[in-house]
Amino acid sequence: MRVSSILSLATSLVSVVQAHTLFTTLYINDVKQGQGDGTCVRENTDLAHANSPVRDLSSDDMACGIGGTVPVNYTCPAPAGAKLTFEYRLNPSKAGQGFIDESHKGPVAVYAKRISSPSADAAGSGWFKLWGEGYDMEADKWATEKIIETNGLISIQIPTALPAGNYLFRPEVVAMHNVTPEVEPQFYIGCAQVFLESSVTGDLNVPSEKSVSIPGYLKKDDPSVIYNIYTDEEYAHPKKPYPMMGPEPFVPAAVSKAASGKVTRQSEGGIPDSCLLVNGNWCGVEVPSYKDDLQGCWNAVKNCWSQADACWAQQLASGGRNCEVWGGKCKDLDSHCSAKDFTGPPAYELKSDDYPAPGPIPAAFNAGDTPQDTSSSTEAPSTTKVVVISSVPVTVTVIPTPTPSTSASLEPIPDFTPRPTSTNTAQPSQTSKPKPHCGGRRRMRTR
């Protein structure tokens, strides 16, 4: 017996341009946050163009990317001085396929902004840079080329002197390959919602010359914006230095804390303990229990599939693999009800379908610039893992990472797990591809 009123899940066949990139995954102290990808990350919700760049310097999308003005459900806690790592992907839903096309050269930076709550507006004043790199003349490499070598992983250390509270951490990857007097760079931006747990409290005082408004921190005629990476002058010897975008990094002075300093902990926006499985910023909770109750059994099945429907509806560009995992639980419930087992819910092992990191997580790029806490006391530890409390066992299974290619093709590739079209979660074949979207023909560098 099955419930005829269970909603059918619509098919979503979308794809992205393989030359581009998207920030999909947050690590805190080398630990992936949540289950799957996208937890605590503001991603572009237009799945068909998820890794498309921001091109308008005056747009609010410059703050946290396209659609990034909308907060996500969860904020991840991080202890003072933690290392944050931002994973970028060519194909948002498939790890290990590269970072960005090698032709897309330019600077990389990480900004931060303290906010009053996770729902606060990202656009506007209060942004400051934690780290940035442009063109390394000695190594003859752009920052993007170095991040290709780290498999799209960008690591920074949170300065220990930053006061506790809600922050947006904003990685910024810029591609300069198509820049002309009429064409602006391509910005690949995202934001991670993080609550910094620390015994440092009070106001955050950033010098005016290092505090910027986003949008507004760049102008169309800035030397860093109109810089042409292909002209002979820039590749002459000696090479012409690249004028880095934005302000100089802000490094707060070291602080000294008393041994009894109280650590401010996160009180809102965390992942609830009732979550059995997480996909991005969706979580599944246990269905209502029932005992010797036929209708209660089928109501539980309906509840489960309703949650699966919500999972697919809320899937991010980083995919819906755990929506498929949750569907397995629903099918198991269905089979128990069909077998007239009307007491439950039955135990079911949920295995998060996680990709491992695409390579070794690099050390913080700004580690040498960040002063350490001078106190001898040890701050109380803060967890950065999601702890799931449930009567149903939950384990994590790591699936193998595809071998990254040495150079990325410019052909568009299918992206995202399609939604199942019925309650048996069968997946349709992928039948469409998008047109390439890269802002014009690639110019060859001249010497």
What are these regions (language model features)?
Residues 167-171:
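A short tyrosine-centered beta-strand micro-motif
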Residues 80, 163-164:
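Surface-exposed loops/turns
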Residues 178-181:
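Short, solvent-exposed loop/turn segments at the edges of extracellular beta-sandwich modules
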Residues 153, 166, 189:
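Short, well-structured alpha-helical interface segments that form or flank functional binding sites
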Residues 152-162:
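Signal that preferentially marks extracellular ectodomain short beta-strand elements
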Residues 172-176:
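Beta-strand-rich extracellular modules
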Residues 2-6, 13-108, 116-150, 183-186, ...:
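Peripheral, solvent-exposed domain-edge segments
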